[in-house]
Regions:
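Helical scaffold of the NTase/Pol beta-like nucleotidyltransferase catalytic core
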Residues: 11-92
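A short acidic (Asp/Glu
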Residues: 88-93, 132-136, 257, 261
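Catalytic metal-binding acidic patch
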Residues: 90-131
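Conserved catalytic core of two-metal-ion nucleotidyltransferases
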Residues: 135-231, 246
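Hydrophobic, aromatic-enriched interface-forming segments
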Residues: 199-288
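Small-residue-rich helix-loop
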Residues: 274-328
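Charge-dense, extended regions
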Residues: 308-387
Length: 387
């Protein structure tokens, strides 16, 4: 476990400084067309690539979160998320006795203002069977009846059903109530790049605290964040505010969620997330906004002020170019699985025959005949959708 910790700390050292007032470092124009898999951080397009993904918490809270993860078998990538990490409501004077944590570190109590909520984690590992085997030896009490059937059964359920995440909820570690989900690293990678389910990709559209890193996941998540911006732009009018943009992005993963329709989820949840985490949304997406040629801030002088990131009273205006060719390219660059679902919906709308549809899918495939990535250029069907 020490190796990934040292690797994480060494890679974060160059990203920990506040760079909010710096211009985004230019990216190679074809970085999205390169295979999104790396074995070393030195292979990133530049040394600061993806630094927007590293959102700040205080050091004591971060150490407490890492201390919790040290109680588990080694993992390759991990993040903490949800309202237990980044608040979705105004701080209240909660009493310590109201905390769900039996005996948490002081840093967690302070971060959660004395009360707090369960802390959620996603743990990504290259081999779920090995992880569960080690974890069952350490923490058999974390598992349901499936744990009695052995790690091979648990990992089969983990990898083959649903979104590929196996959760153990309501677990106490280091005196802190947590929920943790285990996922195969390849499953996480595919969802970030292709939006197979949007379950994990959607969580990473919102502010999270990354605790352990892996270079190919950093690249994949940067693609995921950029895809979220493009998808939101296709849903937004020519002029809108940054809160409308971030609300649209946040809402992508809630589309079709029955909890939002039947009242088991707060109907103001999206607004609460954006309102209370506006600074982190700016840190996460500002450089990506600046990198897109069809998107700009209406008043660029506002973002030149050194304090704009922290000014929660601002709701900056943005504008996008609705040129059909630009919008068609955004359709073409949507994640593969999600784009195919969009194509299927529009196939029915345009009454396209089955054979014509299959030819169109083959022409728009991301891979060439040799398995390499093709340059993503809009075709006639993308242009019809964008009109």
């Amino acid at each position: 476990l020490l190796l990934p910790i040292r690797r994480l700390q060494s890679t974060q050292a160059s990203t920990s400084s506040d760079s909010s007032n710096q211009s985004p470092q230019s990216l190679p124009s074809d970085w999205e067309d390169e295979p999104p898999s790396l074995s070393e951080f030195t292979g990133l397009p530049h040394k600061d690539f993806g630094k927007n993904q590293h959102l700040e918490t205080n050091e004591e809270f971060k150490r407490s979160l890492r201390g919790i993860l040290r109680e588990f078998p080694p993992m390759t990538y991990a993040f903490a998320y949800g309202s237990g990490v980044f608040p979705q409501s105004d701080a209240t004077a909660s009493l310590v006795t109201q905390s769900p944590h039996p005996n948490p570190p002081e840093a967690i109590l302070k971060w959660q203002k004395g009360g707090g909520k369960m802390i959620d984690f996603i743990l990504a590992t290259r081999y779920t069977s090995h992880f569960h085997s080690l974890n069952l030896n350490r923490h058999k009490d974390h598992y349901s009846f499936l744990g009695k059937m052995g790690s091979s059964v648990v990992s089969h359920v983990n990898d083959k059903y649903g979104a590929g995440v196996y959760f153990n909820p309501y677990i106490t570690v280091n005196g802190t109530l947590i929920k943790y989900g285990v996922v195969n690293l390849e499953t996480l990678h595919r969802d970030l790049v292709n939006w197979d389910t949007l379950y994990l990709a959607g969580r990473l559209h919102k502010p999270v605290k990354i605790l352990f890193e892996e270079p190919s996941i950093r690249v994949a998540n940067q693609r995921n964040l950029l895809s979220a911006v493009r998808c939101a732009l296709l849903l937004l009018p020519p002029n809108f505010t940054e809160k409308q943009l971030y609300s649209t992005i946040t809402g992508l993963s809630y589309q079709g969620d029955p909890r939002m329709d039947y009242g088991s989820e707060n109907p103001k949840k999206i607004n609460n997330i954006v309102t209370h985490q506006i600074r982190n949304f700016r840190l996460l997406y500002h450089d990506l906004i600046m990198s897109l040629p069809n998107l700009s801030y209406t008043d660029t002088s506002a973002i030149s002020k050194p304090t704009w990131l922290d000014d929660t009273t601002l709701d900056l205006k943005l504008q996008q170019d609705l040129d059909p060719s630009r919008r068609a390219n955004m359709v073409r660059r949507l994640p593969k699985s999600f784009r195919e679902k969009v194509y299927f919906l529009y196939r029915r709308k345009f009454n396209i025959s089955g054979r014509e549809y299959q030819d169109m899918l083959e022409a728009s495939a991301d891979e060439d005949a040799k398995g390499g990535l093709k340059k993503q250029s809009a075709g006639p069907f993308d242009r019809r959708i964008a009109e």
